[in-house]
Amino acid sequence: MPAMEKLAGNFFLVGLMGAGKTTVGRALARRTGKTFYDSDQEIEARTGVRVATIFDIEGEMRFRNREACVIRDLAQQRDIVLATGGGAVLREENRKVLASHGTVIYLRASIDDLLARTQHDKNRPLLQIADPRAKLESLFNERDPFYREIADIIIDTTQQNVNLLVGRLVDQLLDSPHHPKETD
């Protein structure tokens, strides 16, 4: 069995929208043989409603309540990769759950890359405004300290090939003292 499949425990991806959490998460799960979850997709599956609609009807606070339940539930599982919503770290409860149940990986990218990756996505309720660049900058300034607070690994996804990035990430995970490795 290749060493990369010997990585035990949960991997939680945090970062701003467009940083690559879902894309990298899927590839990391494939590479390590783990089950992949996306907290936004899990909320949609449980409610039968799009995240943008939940934001519109219930507001951000109620969405964050749903998100906290999903994170708490999924963190109890073993050997998963979870791509969290960009704002999940705003709640101390979520930060504690993530930090105590697995390895937290902060994916960061330049504002230019984030904007390029999200500008045509109508399912980003926080960016449906006149100046999405200013909003991304504001979100970065607000959330970056929280991402850093719980991150075991920080990796830059700016202009990165997903397969190369996942390879680098697996190397860092193998070298990281922050996660358990299975023993034979």
Swiss-Prot record:
GO molecular function, one term: shikimate kinase activity
Entry EC number(s): 2.7.1.71
GO cellular component: cytosol
Biological processes annotated in GO: amino acid biosynthetic process; aromatic amino acid family biosynthetic process; chorismate biosynthetic process
Keywords noted in UniProt: Amino-acid biosynthesis, Aromatic amino acid biosynthesis, ATP-binding, Cytoplasm, Kinase, Magnesium, Metal-binding, Nucleotide-binding, Transferase
Cofactors named for this entry: Mg(2+)
Binding residue positions for ATP: G18, A19, G20, K21, T22, T23, R124, Q160
Assembly mode: Monomer.
Protein name stated in the entry: Shikimate kinase
Gene: aroK
